[in-house]
Amino acid sequence: MTSLPSSVIKWRFFRRQMPSDVVFSLCLLCFASCLAGKITVLADSDKSVLLRFKKTVSDPGSILASWVEESEDYCSWFGVSCDSSSRVMALNISGSGSSEISRNRFTCGDIGKFPLYGFGVRRDCTGNHGALAGNLPSVIMSLTGLRVLSLPFNSFSGEIPVGIWGMEKLEVLDLEGNLMTGSLPDQFTGLRNLRVMNLGFNRVSGEIPNSLQNLTKLEILNLGGNKLNGTVPGFVGRFRVLHLPLNWLQGSLPKDIGDSCGKLEHLDLSGNFLTGRIPESLGKCAGLRSLLLYMNTLEETIPLEFGSLQKLEVLDVSRNTLSGPLPVELGNCSSLSVLVLSNLYNVYEDINSVRGEADLPPGADLTSMTEDFNFYQGGIPEEITRLPKLKILWVPRATLEGRFPGDWGSCQNLEMVNLGQNFFKGEIPVGLSKCKNLRLLDLSSNRLTGELLKEISVPCMSVFDVGGNSLSGVIPDFLNNTTSHCPPVVYFDRFSIESYSDPSSVYLSFFTEKAQVGTSLIDLGSDGGPAVFHNFADNNFTGTLKSIPLAQERLGKRVSYIFSAGGNRLYGQFPGNLFDNCDELKAVYVNVSFNKLSGRIPQGLNNMCTSLKILDASVNQIFGPIPTSLGDLASLVALNLSWNQLQGQIPGSLGKKMAALTYLSIANNNLTGQIPQSFGQLHSLDVLDLSSNHLSGGIPHDFVNLKNLTVLLLNNNNLSGPIPSGFATFAVFNVSSNNLSGPVPSTNGLTKCSTVSGNPYLRPCHVFSLTTPSSDSRDSTGDSITQDYASSPVENAPSQSPGKGGFNSLEIASIASASAIVSVLIALVILFFYTRKWHPKSKIMATTKREVTMFMDIGVPITFDNVVRATGNFNASNLIGNGGFGATYKAEISQDVVVAIKRLSIGRFQGVQQFHAEIKTLGRLRHPNLVTLIGYHASETEMFLVYNYLPGGNLEKFIQERSTRDWRVLHKIALDIARALAYLHDQCVPRVLHRDVKPSNILLDDDCNAYLSDFGLARLLGTSETHATTGVAGTFGYVAPEYAMTCRVSDKADVYSYGVVLLELLSDKKALDPSFVSYGNGFNIVQWACMLLRQGRAKEFFTAGLWDAGPHDDLVEVLHLAVVCTVDSLSTRPTMKQVVRRLKQLQPPSC
């Protein structure tokens, strides 16, 4: 056989038929070999990308210490996760945001400052250390297999690299809490698989782009805490979770926001500048679980359509400008557990520390952003109180009225109810006593009557507050009626992570903390730990006090306890049994002031309650000596035993062990002897009030070592010797009406002469004027609001020639008179040019905008033209008043329709825009004893307010003419004004300080009903709430002494002014009556009242005929009340709520 060529043999071999499985295996092997090679190359590339990333960023905390070239297993590096092919699929590096080089103002720990932020996206901050910084490296885009990019709470800055928007496989983009700037792109080239985008708390600006709706798989979007502006787009309802809080979003919400919201579960639009109505279409979002719209300026009513939200668990619409009745349909939200319709606590109170004023949009006002409030009509439908899953019902200070809800269903889940500071009437229903899981019940400052139910689980409640009502009967012995087990005391730890799958737990802890530290007695924040607060104050409770209503489970060294029952009619012996179990608590605060308690302070109080921090038993009838054992209460911070009948000497033990004592007042008692030298050891003391006793001896020289002392009141005693020199500057200082001698030392040149008057042996008080009178420091009558101060005998002594004496009294008087005339002339010249420069011309300029904004309908239209016409172009013939803010004119708009027009002095105001913002708040205020603000006009050349017209004139005229001596009429006037001020102070958000309470600002109708006018106008002048930056801060004679010393005003300054008005109403004297001249310089009606009371001559104070006609005891009680309102110590002055309560207790019977 002939052999074949070798080449042919080879071909034939390869041409032989091979089995198909062998062919497939060979092909697969070849493909795998090629793929493995490629994967190896890609994996090596991922490692190099990570190393380049590390090289690019700043890492002062060595977070990336494990990322080293020598390590082959880069998939085990910190923050790196890989798939089965060793491709990097996740980069998850959470920083603390608190490294030393970090410029980031929002750290992971700062989440605790915004407890309601981030449902569905909240994270645990524990275990995070350090922070990466620098620009976000664009090399990260080379990780083409990356599905999760999570770098929250670092300090990355600059714009987000453009390439990130094109990463096709990325599912999670989390850059929360960095410093990223720039805006979101108009178009996204990738991100088709993105499910989560979290850019919260960066500095991203611009508008929300429509291109976001192209990311069809996006479910969770968090853009909160940025600088996004523009409006909320309609497509945002397509996401499952949407967070846009704390941005610059403005305008109305789109009406169609709920048209495509089938997946929406969480929607947070809080802390923006949204206006207009809440869209009804949100009622179509059937899967919605939480809806947070708080802290905007949304208007009108809550949509009825919300009743369709069967899965809704949390609804918070607080701090808006909503109105109207609460919809009954909310009772259909069967899953609702948290309902917040108003809220006095600012959830974003720490916004300044994170964002600052500079981060607000142009023209925005942070104050107005946090001061809006809702004012509803009617009451709470019982369909809401019967909701089966309701845990929190929070509607304080929302102008709700009517009968208190009686049907609370089974209330098995109910834990918090806050309906305080409304206008509910009636009794506390039996149904509430069945709510055994209640841990907070606040019904304070309503108009509730009847007796307290002993079945209410008060001993188990962390907060129980019924203060400021008209409840009567005894305070029950709740302990004998508590059978159920108490839930644990909740304390909010702002740095811990809560279960954010249950938003109600966040609200529970947040409100618990706020309610505890927001008590009127003390801020417990410095002590920390849980607290229990039980408030029965300012009611009509009688009887004796039992043991503190605190369950056994509540006792423990971690718990602080506050008990307040002041302002009632409690009687009996000093309640020593109240301090049982006191030593089983961390700290105890007790207020039983303004009652009728008698007897002695128990000698063993120090052994009963070593944890006592505050004891206020002022304004009672306690007698006997002060126990020496009180000095052993080393934890005591404040002790107030003023206005009692204590006798004997002040024990020296009070100053030896009480190192923590900051406040001590034992004024207005019958104490004798000397001031203990041991008081010089009270180095923490801030306030010392020993006034109006019978103390003798000298002022201890060691007082000059009390560097923290700001208030020293020793007036109205029998002290002798010199006034020690070397005192620190006092906010309040008074040693008048003693027997002191020697020179008057200057306390940094600011000792008022009136504070040392009534000491016949003191050298004459040399006077200088603290301020030069100007147009801004004059009241409506032209009285200059200046004060006389003692000058230093050295610094202010006139130069004397050798051998010559000083100026004689006649020369001094002549110089003083000449100086006064010159000052007045200068003031008149300044006033002339000021008015020439700023005040509008008498005729209305043609360019004035003619819009009049109305807050209510009075049946006839009020226009700019008919106001000008009705006032005769503001003619003097229609002038009915002239004050510091402008002139007031009577205007008959049409037949039987008369209004009062207050034409404002434009030169005083900061601008029309601010005026519009401020007047909006005043226009909402409604109270039976406030002059009603009907409308206003404001332009660059003209401003006026429209008020209801009151034909009875003002109280100043009433007192001068002494129109009546009927005690019932006088009492009603006093009560009317007290109610108006209490409303401004305690039921307005923000609270309104009047700053100029005086008879001419109190108007009367024909039936002698009283109305307070000019409220809120001081704020319109552009002054802050606590600092008076212009002269409009009161009228001389009515100004509180602390304002003269510190230029600070508060609600207690209004209380002082009210007390002066009340004294005028009771007497026939003015605040600075000419008849007081004989008593010396600076003597006023307050000092006159104190003098007569101290001398037992109260009868002489009252106007002729009033004493004979009125009940003597009640008249003296009201006189005492007026004097307490005018004491120098702010903490001793009552609140206006307490004044109202006391006047109601002294109300004379009607005919």
UniProtKB/Swiss-Prot annotation:
Residues 772-802 are annotated as: Disordered. Belongs to the protein kinase superfamily. Ser/Thr protein kinase family. Glycans are attached at N92, N214, N229, N332, N481, N540, N591, N640, N670, N708, N718, N734, N739. One of its GO terms (biological process) is pollen maturation. Residues 833-1151 are cytoplasmic. ATP binds at I880, G881, N882, G883, G884, F885, G886, A887, T888, K902. It is a single-pass type I membrane protein. Expressed in root tips, flowers, leaf meristems, and the bottom parts of the surrounding young leaves and trichomes. Keywords: ATP-binding, Cell membrane, Developmental protein, Glycoprotein, Kinase, Leucine-rich repeat, Membrane, Nucleotide-binding, Phosphoprotein, Receptor, Repeat, Serine/threonine-protein kinase, Signal, Transferase, Transmembrane, Transmembrane helix. Residues 1-35 form the signal peptide. Its EC number is 2.7.11.1. Residues 36-811 are extracellular. Induction: Slightly by dehydration and low temperature. The active site is at D996 (proton acceptor). The chain crosses the membrane at residues 812-832. Residues 782-802 have a biased composition (Polar residues). It catalyses: L-seryl-[protein] + ATP = O-phospho-L-seryl-[protein] + ADP + H(+); L-threonyl-[protein] + ATP = O-phospho-L-threonyl-[protein] + ADP + H(+). The modification Phosphotyrosine is found at Y947, Y983, Y1038. Disruption phenotype: Impaired central domain protoderm patterning defects, and defective cotyledon primordia cell types. Enhanced shoot growth, and male sterility due to defects in anther dehiscence and pollen maturation. Residues 874-1146 form the Protein kinase domain. It is an enzyme of class 2 (transferase). Pfam families: LRR_1, LRR_8, LRRNT_2, Pkinase. The modification Phosphothreonine is found at T863, T871, T1046. The keyword Transcription does not apply. This is LRR receptor-like serine/threonine-protein kinase RPK2. It is found in: Cell membrane.
